[in-house]
């Protein structure tokens, strides 16, 4: 499956042979869980199983919640309170689902930044990376629509602000916005549409996750060195790899148990810590909250959206050159989606021949600045648009684009990487010793 020489499934009994000839599902499962995996994978590689588990958790709890939820502006808020008070275990389902979204995004951000550090986007894994970024976009859309469903103050006004971004598109924007809303403003049609899509999209995400896994099983997994598994012979491949089962499955399950211990501690003891108190007030179109804040996992890109105000020189320049077509609001929308797009383009923006950041000293420095930059954007995204937060968000947004569009391409031409190991086996033995000795 991965092109790495290894033992494949061979049916032994007559029933196994009969089934394998007609539906080779046992062989598919065998080749999936026994796939040769680089033996030097570290703890940064445990977040894939966390993401897979959380996706299943979100789908299951979401289905249960949908059984008791009513997508109507007059009943939605009350139906959520009904779930909390009258449905057996309803409070647990809701808190697991709400905090599960936070765990999902925390895991995906770690997963993305791990990929950026170890060069998991480089050839031949570009398709894996692109599919992953599409999954991330669908996650954002699903989470946004789910946040609207409780029909609290922050739900309603968050929907008003975010759908208003589509209205900023010149010419066709207002029509797209009205089509999304189902009318001139956020109302019952909007709630019904968002509920339908929020129910549907997790299954689309699950299908893309299967493609994502298929893609990296085809190319083989990346690893901390960025060195490819030797494929010249089965003997060489076995020196670089271990079967996914039982070695990495057991490690991943242990890590998952630790993550879930922390997750359920949050669910049990501080389930509303990451929420907003305004969302416990029923939506009121006549009363605007003092400060509209999205969920924490949207804050970095929300900060970029707000960073490019009308008085920023580049916005003034673009506004003038386009004769007002690209105004500050539309520029912010472009910047927000552009910040995600530059991540998707990383395979072509990074010109270095060395895959892993572990052997790129200058890259490491700029990368950790990027991580700090992401944290700063998360912080200022929750702050009001006033001095000094507006300036901090502008500087942080500028660095985000500079890293991908300027620093990454230049590093490939100017950086002198450190020596990389000749094989995964060499790297493994340097850390843990040669098991043959």
Swiss-Prot record:
- Report the main location listed first in the record: membrane
Question: Which InterPro entries does the annotation name?
Answer: Cyt_b/b6_C, Cyt_b/b6_C_sf, Cyt_b/b6_N, Cytb/b6-like_sf, Cytochrome_b, Cytochrome_b_C_euk/bac, Cytochrome_b_N_euk/bac, Di-haem_cyt_TM
User: Which GO CC annotations does the UniProt entry carry?
Assistant: plasma membrane; respiratory chain complex III
What are the GO BP annotations of this UniProt entry? respiratory electron transport chain
Where is heme b b566 bound in this sequence? 111, 212
Query: Which cofactors must be present for this protein to function?
Result: heme b
MF terms in GO: metal ion binding; ubiquinol-cytochrome-c reductase activity
Bilayer-crossing residues are 45-65, 100-120, 129-149, 156-176, 194-214, 248-268, 298-318, 330-350, 365-385, 391-411
What SUPFAM superfamilies does this protein's entry cite?
a domain/subunit of cytochrome bc1 complex (Ubiquinol-cytochrome c reductase) (SSF81648), Transmembrane di-heme cytochromes (SSF81342)
**Binding of heme b b562: at which residues?**
97, 198
Q: Fetch the PROSITE patterns from UniProt.
A: CYTB_CTER, CYTB_NTER
Q: Which UniProt keywords apply?
A: Cell membrane, Electron transport, Heme, Iron, Membrane, Metal-binding, Respiratory chain, Transmembrane, Transmembrane helix, Transport
Per its UniProt record, what Gene3D superfamilies does this chain match? Cytochrome Bc1 Complex, Chain C
The protein's location, in the record's own words, is: Cell membrane
Pfam families noted in UniProt: Cytochrom_B_C, Cytochrome_B
Asked if the Swiss-Prot or TrEMBL record annotates the protein with the keyword Membrane, the reply is: yes
The source's superkingdom equals: Bacteria
Claim: Repeat is one of the keywords in the record: no
What family is this? Belongs to the cytochrome b family.
Q: What else is known?
A: Heme 1 (or BL or b562) is low-potential and absorbs at about 562 nm, and heme 2 (or BH or b566) is high-potential and absorbs at about 566 nm.
Which PANTHER family does this chain map to?
A: CYTOCHROME B
Please identify the protein, giving its name as recorded: Cytochrome b
**Lineage, opening ranks:** Bacteria, Pseudomonadati, Pseudomonadota, Alphaproteobacteria, Rhodobacterales
């Amino acid at each position: 499956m991965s092109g790495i020489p290894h033992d494949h499934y061979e049916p032994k009994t007559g029933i196994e042979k009969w089934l394998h000839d007609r539906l080779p599902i046992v062989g598919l499962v065998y080749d999936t869980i026994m796939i040769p995996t680089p033996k030097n994978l570290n703890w940064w590689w445990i977040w894939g199983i966390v993401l897979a588990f959380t996706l299943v958790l979100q789908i299951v709890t979401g289905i249960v919640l949908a059984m008791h939820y009513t997508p109507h502006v007059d009943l939605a808020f009350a139906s959520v309170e009904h779930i909390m008070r009258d449905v057996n275990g309803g409070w647990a389902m809701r808190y697991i689902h709400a905090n599960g979204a936070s765990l999902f995004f925390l895991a995906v951000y770690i997963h993305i930044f791990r990929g950026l550090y170890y060069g998991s986007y480089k050839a031949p894994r570009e398709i894996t990376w692109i599919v992953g970024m599409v999954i991330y976009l669908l996650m954002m859309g699903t989470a946004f629509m789910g946040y609207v469903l409780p029909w609290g103050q922050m739900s309603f006004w968050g929907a008003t602000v975010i759908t208003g971004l589509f209205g900023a598109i010149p010419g066709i924007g207002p029509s797209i916005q009205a089509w999304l809303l189902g009318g001139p403003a956020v109302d019952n049609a909007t709630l019904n549409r968002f509920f339908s899509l929020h129910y549907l999209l997790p299954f689309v995400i699950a299908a893309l996750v299967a493609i994502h896994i298929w893609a990296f099983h085809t190319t083989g997994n990346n690893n901390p060195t960025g060195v490819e598994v030797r494929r010249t012979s089965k003997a060489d491949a076995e020196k670089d790899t271990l079967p996914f089962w039982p070695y990495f499955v057991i490690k991943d399950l242990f890590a998952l148990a630790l993550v879930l211990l922390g997750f359920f501690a949050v669910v049990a003891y501080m389930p509303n810590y990451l929420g907003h108190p305004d969302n416990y007030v029923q939506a009121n179109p006549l009363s605007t909250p003092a400060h509209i804040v999205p969920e924490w996992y949207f804050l970095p890109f929300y900060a970029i959206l707000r960073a490019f105000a009308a008085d920023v020189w580049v916005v003034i320049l673009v506004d003038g050159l386009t004769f007002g077509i690209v105004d500050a609001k539309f520029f912010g929308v472009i910047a927000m989606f552009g910040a995600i797009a530059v991540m998707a383009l990383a395979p072509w923006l990074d010109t270095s021949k060395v895959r892993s950041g572990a052997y790129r000293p200058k890259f490491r420095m700029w990368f950790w600045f990027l991580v700090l930059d992401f944290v700063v954007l998360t912080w200022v995204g929750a702050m009001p648009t006033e001095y000094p937060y507006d300036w901090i968000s502008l500087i942080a947004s500028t660095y985000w684009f500079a890293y991908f569009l300027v620093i990454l391409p230049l590093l490939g031409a100017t950086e002198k990487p450190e020596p990389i190991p000749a094989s995964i086996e060499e790297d493994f033995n340097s850390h843990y010793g040669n098991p043959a000795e």
